[in-house]
Amino acid sequence: MMKVLVVVALLVTLISYSSSEGIDDLEADELLSLMADEQTRKECIPKHHECTSNKHGCCRGNFFKYKCQCTTVVTQDGEQTERCFCGTPPHHKAAELVVGFGKKIFG
C-alpha cells in the first residue's frame, strides 16, 4: 500500500510540474502574441490614408476594422490607375450610427 501511495504522489508531482511548464510556455507565447499585436497596431494604416500597396493593413476604428476601398483613377493621358484608401464601409457606418443612437437613449 505504501508503494502505491509513493507512486501516486510521484505521478501527481510529475503531472503538476509538466502542466506548470506548459502554462509558462503558453504565457510566453501569449506575451509574444501581444507584442506582435502592438507592433501591428503601430504599423497599421490610419483612416483616409492610402492603402494601395497594403490592402489588409488598415487600422481598427471604434467598432470595426477599416476597409481598404479602391477606385480607378483616369489621368489626363488616359492611363488608368487604381488608388485605395482606408475607410469605413457604408454598412459599418450604419451600424455605428445605430449603436451610438442606442447608447444615447439607453445610457
Swiss-Prot record:
Disulfide bonds: 44-59, 51-68, 58-86, 70-84
Tissue: Expressed by the venom gland.
GO molecular function list: toxin activity
Database matches in PROSITE patterns: SPIDER_CSTX
Subcellular location per the Swiss-Prot or TrEMBL entry: Secreted
Signal sequence annotation: 1-20
Keywords: Disulfide bond, Knottin, Secreted, Signal, Toxin
Residue ranges listed under propeptide: 21-41
Keyword Calcium: no
Predominant location: secreted
Classification via Pfam families: Toxin_35 (PF10530)
GO cellular component: extracellular region
Family: Belongs to the neurotoxin 19 (CSTX) family. 04 (U1-Lctx) subfamily.
Domain writeup: The presence of a 'disulfide through disulfide knot' structurally defines this protein as a knottin.
Name the UniProt record assigns to this protein: U1-lycotoxin-Ls1b
